[in-house]
């Protein structure tokens, strides 16, 4: 198995989501790609969500925010430079969601945080959600 690491220094959500899609579509077999990025003032919605139902669009526009849609499902999430986004990308033969989530929780524990994975693939610290994963 090969591990590849990517970081985007671009804070444009459309660029970052397009790069994530490209990394997914071009990922070779037996490879895991780990991708890190940050977006400026953005609401990202899932592929099947209605922006009108999920986002206060007038307020987002007033605040000069950006609306973006990811290709995967999941709920609406707010991004800014205070949070770090990550993706594990790989085919089913190398990808193990519980294992990946446990690795992240363990890394947080190693840094002194009381982190654990809950039943929805979210990571919690002291019972508060710090990472949602799809």
Task: Enumerate the predicted regions with their spans.
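N-terminal lobe of the biotin/lipoate ligase/transferase fold
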Residues: 1-95
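Catalytic beta-strand/loop module used to bind and position nucleotide/cofactor moieties
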Residues: 81-134
């Amino acid at each position: 198995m090969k591990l590849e690491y990517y970081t985007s220094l671009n804070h444009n959500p459309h660029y970052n989501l397009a790069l994530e899609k490209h990394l997914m579509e071009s990922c070779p077999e037996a490879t895991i790609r780990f991708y890190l990025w940050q977006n400026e003032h953005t609401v990202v919605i899932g592929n099947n969500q209605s922006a009108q139902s999920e986002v206060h669009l007038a307020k987002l526009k007033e605040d000069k925010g950006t609306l973006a849609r990811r290709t995967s499902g999941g709920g609406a999430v707010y991004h800014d430079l205070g949070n770090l986004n990550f993706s594990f990308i790989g085919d089913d033969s190398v990808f193990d969601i519980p294992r990946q989530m446990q690795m992240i929780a363990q890394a947080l524990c190693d840094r002194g945080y009381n982190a654990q994975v809950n039943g929805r693939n979210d990571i919690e610290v002291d019972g508060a959600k710090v990472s949602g994963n799809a």
